[in-house]
Amino acid sequence: MQKRSSFDSAEIMHRAEDLMQAASNRYRITVQVAQRAKRRRYEEFDAVEDPLMKPPIRAIIEMSDELTQPEIIGE
């Protein structure tokens, strides 16, 4: 039985590519996504909005939405 997800994997890949292209350092943006995902995981451990959306995917979506804020991408 296949589970239906509430997000499109192609859209997630596109957003991740946009993050990588906007960043000056691929390693740094990867670490920032991982840190945000880890932080969100512990902050919202009890309040699960969408159990199918994992913290790294949520972090990619949030960070791609914040591309207009340069402090998110890096110095």
From Swiss-Prot:
Q: Would the keyword Transcription be found if you checked this record's keyword annotation?
A: yes
- Which keywords label this protein? DNA-directed RNA polymerase, Nucleotidyltransferase, Transcription, Transferase
Q: Which reaction is recorded as catalysed by this protein?
A: RNA(n) + a ribonucleoside 5'-triphosphate = RNA(n+1) + diphosphate
Q: What is its EC number?
A: 2.7.7.6
Per its UniProt record, what InterPro entries does this chain match?
Answer: DNA-dir_RNA_pol_omega (IPR003716), Pol_omega/Rpo6/RPB6 (IPR006110), RPB6/omega-like_sf (IPR036161)
Tell me which domain of life the UniProt entry assigns to the organism this sequence originates from.
Bacteria
Designated name of the protein: DNA-directed RNA polymerase subunit omega
